[in-house]
A protein has these predicted regions:
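Membrane-embedded alpha-helical bundles of multi-pass transporters/translocases
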Residues: 1-351
Length: 351
């Protein structure tokens, strides 16, 4: 007897859960800008040196790396009535929202106090981030009854992730200018609160309304890997190669996301509000190309299309190196080109 596929409701609610990427985008795009604003940003003052900010970031990432297998193991063993993955999302959601907001209300009594604040909040942020993101992504194999379900869940996640990332990249520049009314710090704080509430709402919609326990009841009796066995798989050759490629690509992707604000303000010499236009071009191109990329990938293989998309992205980013205030009009088609590359490389590669 053929396995019954998942309902449209399940796909929709699962897709809502990746709204934590709104918080991820705010973190990557606006945190550095807030603590290390460009010199022509008159209402913000540098709060940390680049070196101290990097050390604070590294501390958070170390926490993330250390907790990931532990959270995976604990969620595998969970017997919560809400579902073993949803339970951890519920635990991590509110701390994730609170810590993101606290980044933008730092201690300012001294540079060391600010550094310790950022390092501490960063560690707590990534603890909460791991509690949400790890179990959420683990839902795909738990929920899928068939190979088609698995592909569809991955596609839904990628589509929603693209949409949520676009929302968090395109709209904040406008809201910061509008809500700040000339005060960038005030605008950033109010915008962060607004988008954090929006982002975390989707996480709780997914956690409470997915009905994970009901959908995975027949699977929870399956034997799960021991922690030491999970760690052993993590050091296999194929896993290391995949992780290295994943790490290198997303390091570059996060750099691109993180420098957009600086690029618009310092290189193109435009206002923060202009970031809305640039981000709309970048993610608009990615959104338009995304379904086309998917069809081409099925026809010619994901590997070939992924290589082509990365090549397009490389050409676009190299071109951006030669943009100045005098020829800044060239940045617009180059960001569109980057968006075309991102349509596959950033949103198909994780599948």
């Amino acid at each position: 007897m053929a396995e019954k596929g998942l309902s449209k409701r399940t796909y929709l609610i699962y897709g809502m859960g990746v709204s934590y990427f709104i918080l991820d985008q705010i973190y990557n795009q606006w945190l550095s800008f807030y603590y290390l604003p460009p010199s022509n940003e008159v209402t913000l003052k540098p709060l940390l040196t680049p070196t101290l900010l990097i050390f604070a970031f590294i501390f958070g990432r170390m926490i993330d790396a250390a907790l990931d297998p532990i959270v995976g193991y604990l969620s595998d063993k969970s017997k919560s009535k809400y579902g073993r993955r949803s339970f951890f999302m519920m635990i991590g959601g509110l701390p994730l929202a609170l810590t993101l907001i606290l980044f933008f209300f730092p201690l300012k009594s001294s540079i060391m106090a600010t550094f310790l604040w950022v390092a501490l909040i960063n560690g707590l942020f990534f603890t909460a981030y791991t509690l949400v993101s790890g179990p959420y992504n683990a839902l795909i194999p738990d929920l899928a009854n068939t190979k088609e379900d698995r592909i569809n869940l991955s596609t839904v996640q990628s589509t929603f992730r693209l949409a949520f990332t676009a929302i968090a990249m395109i709209l904040p520049g406008y809201f910061i200018a509008k809500m700040g009314n000339g005060n960038t710090e005030k605008g950033i704080r109010l915008t962060v609160i607004l988008f954090t509430v929006l982002g975390i709402a989707g996480v709780y919609i997914c956690a409470f309304f997915l009905k994970e326990r009901e959908l995975t009841q027949s699977r929870e009796k399956l034997e799960t890997l021991k922690l030491k066995d999970s760690l052993k798989y993590a050091f296999e050759k194929e896993t290391i190669i995949y992780f290295a490629a994943f790490f290198l690509f997303f390091s570059g992707f996060n750099i691109l996301r993180g420098v957009v604000n600086y690029y618009v303000v310092s290189v193109m010499e435009l206002s923060v509000k202009s970031n809305t236009i640039i981000s709309a071009l970048l993610f608009g191109a990615a959104a338009i190309a995304f379904p086309i990329t998917g069809k081409l990938a099925k026809k010619y293989s994901y590997k070939k299309i992924l290589i082509a998309d990365i090549a397009i992205l490389i050409v676009g980013t190299i071109g951006l190196l030669f943009v100045t205030k005098d020829n800044r009009i060239l940045a617009y088609p180059l960001f569109i080109l980057c968006g075309l590359g991102l349509s596959g490389s950033a949103f198909i590669f994780p599948l």
